[in-house]
Amino acid sequence: EYSFEMNAYNRTLLSQIQRASRSADAMRLYPGAFSETLVQLMKEKKLSNKKLADASLVGERTIQRLRNEEEYPTTVQTVLGLCYGLQLSVPEAEMLVGKTDFNIKPTNPQNNAYRCVLSSCAENSIYEVNEMLESCGFEPLGSSKLG
């Protein structure tokens, strides 16, 4: 019995905390490269390129290229879109972003907003988060051109 309300958000957060040790062990086993990690995460979540494209607002061809070409140019919005499509926990999302050249420093207003939304990858849809970001004048997550 807990003293806090067991709503959907708290249930998800408690579950993530309970799995923290296992999750940390698992993250140490991911490959060093972004592309290989993306492939492994998609496999674990049983997501095809099409399903991930629908959930992340990143084009299927872009996902295919990111899986196959380590040096394929991308944007922070695309990577964060993938975090949403994969429904990653905060540590998993930070791990995936950490395998890119992006540094999401909180001193930049847009980056600070992106850091805030990273915490809801497992709870919110990308559509909800994009509506919030755009209402505040920030670029939405996903690919601008779905190719």
Which positions does each model-derived feature cover?
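Recognition helix of helix-turn-helix/homeodomain-like DNA-binding domains
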Residues: 57-74, 98-99
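Short, charged recognition helix plus adjacent turn
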Residues: 3-5, 13-14, 94-124, 143-144
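A short, Lys/Arg-rich alpha-helix, primarily the initiator
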Residues: 15-47, 126-146
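Conserved hydrophobic/aromatic packing and binding residues within compact polymer-binding modules
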Residues: 38, 52-53, 63-66
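Key DNA-contact positions within bacterial/archaeal DNA-binding proteins
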Residues: 50, 61, 91
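Short, basic-rich loop-to-helix N-cap that marks the start of a DNA-contacting helix
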Residues: 70-84
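Short alpha-helical "recognition helix" segments of helix-turn-helix
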Residues: 48-55, 82
